[in-house]
Amino acid sequence: FPEEIGEYSLSNLFATFGHAKLLSRTQHPHLHSNGIHTHPMTLLFNALVTHKRVLFVAYHAPAKVVVDHVLAACAFVGGCGAVLRGFVASAMPYATLVNIDALSHQRGFIVGTKHPRLAELGLWDVLCHCEAQSITVSPRLSPPRPLPPFLDTRHPARPSLRHTLRSMPECMLGD
């Protein structure tokens, strides 16, 4: 698969965050899809699929821990590279203070770090603390804009596929 990535462990990701503490003051409908009963992995999936800025931190563990979690998160949300694409391009398995400028201009990312300053700067929407086994949603995260109405009465409705097929000559439909 074009976005298949190397070494990672979905088992470690689920073991770390499968029973994580959710730390957030407010509920975000695009993240907390089941309200206060949202499973931590569902919140993480929702954050990744809606291109939030997700930061994995582990201050006292080896760098491999955050790298492994970032790569596993890419595989988790993208179906191991076979279903959804584009997550590998927005991933940075290990970031340092040198990367702050690039991260501050990026709309969504999946980043890992051991440096506490990156978490303190608040460049994240969702903070996944690998050692504390907690997921924190930023209080600065704004709610999503409302979706446009399903039926727009200003424009005439387009004919359905069934109507289009019925109006086509039989020779165009084939067997």
Predicted regions and their residues:
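Beta-strand-rich binding-surface signature
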Residues: 53, 74, 107
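N-terminal uDENN/longin-like adaptor modules and analogous extended polar/low-complexity scaffolding regions
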Residues: 1-63
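A eukaryote-biased sequence property
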Residues: 71, 83, 88-175
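A general structural signal for short secondary-structure junctions and capping/turn motifs
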Residues: 45-47, 67, 99-103
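Histidine (H) residue identity feature
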Residues: 19, 28-32, 37-39, 51, ...
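Residues within HEAT/ARM-like alpha-solenoid scaffolds
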Residues: 65-68, 72
